[in-house]
């Protein structure tokens, strides 16, 4: 039934579940109706949030549910990530898989890339099939089973099964949790940036604790015990999300904003089948040519990860569902996306290049106490937790006078470059064979986390502001595709990080970031013009 450009949810007491009537349209709103006396239908519209809802540190109560969901999901992910590179390259006699370090670093990067690439799938299924809340829950279940797979001592097969499950699960969960955070705020609500900053704070609470606990279990006792603890963390997150979601999240998030028409499902199945068959044919061709190995497979995934955002930007810019104003917003977002991709390429090397530096070129004995290399992964969230209150207060105090999102991005890029300039110094002074003070790693992370707070929460926030109505969750996926593309690049460039070349490597990465920051400074005004008043 078509009417008034709204999707309508009709709640009928006599039926076990609500039915959805598609009532067309550009607005993609969900309005709640309820059946009452005499069969009269009355409006019961409940917005995602109101400006009066300030029960969670001045923020909407629903933010607490999403805060703790992401906290536990990040606990599981970063706990696993803190020990995974060591699990891959430690010898079999030490409980590892025996990969060489270069391969382990490359796999770590492409793994992270695929985790965020799958967010495209999560955004699509949320928008068209399940709605945000269901998609997040299904993703959490897959993540939990992915960690369970790693907890079983079944060698490389368990690793690859785990990678597949966590890649799919994270893709379903991450973009939709962030999209729901954006939905908690009305347009023009100045709490949005501070709300996302608090949300990122929650992410980093889980990320801070995980390397200590999972890293301690994994490196001191048994890798599989560490992975088991990561699985328990995701289970706790699912329980909290299930309970809190019923109480504090709007029913709107249970339903897709742009549901599939009956004929669309067939098209989806056909296109998915074609894509899968094409991928298999490429693998078969590589096998026939004798080039199907782990290195070339990683290269293939790198190409896919870089091509995907290009395809999606093309769709957004040419879709008839996108208005002229929204199209300008997408062009503005493209500039921010490229800057974010470069930033994440640097920041995400913490789990690969800096993890290797921590294990091989850092003096990890301080006052007689041995620091497990995995513990350095807590530096990222530690500094985020230290800095976040100051950034939140600063943005709140400045209010509408705060710098624009492009200006924050430009400043962040310069800080990111500076963080790698710091890493040049110890190698240049003491040589690549020396074990240097841990303070060099501490200093580098301290600087890049300033960059992260200028880019990550702001990027999450501006994505929800610039997203076209018809592609809200899929646009949210684009933010994670920036991370995916950055890590895909890493999967290739980390191979340049070799003994004796560390200083050149750090210097080259720093120069790229600083030049990108300078270019971003020059583009602040043009991007602001395209954003048309959105900060």
Residue ranges and their predicted role:
Residues 109-124, 378-391:
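Central cavity-lining transmembrane alpha-helices of secondary-active solute carriers
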Residues 32-61, 187, 215-351, 355, ...:
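Intracellular loop-helix junctions on the cytosolic face of multi-pass helical membrane proteins
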Residues 193-211, 218, 233, 478-490:
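Glycine-rich segments within core transmembrane alpha-helices of 12-TM secondary carriers
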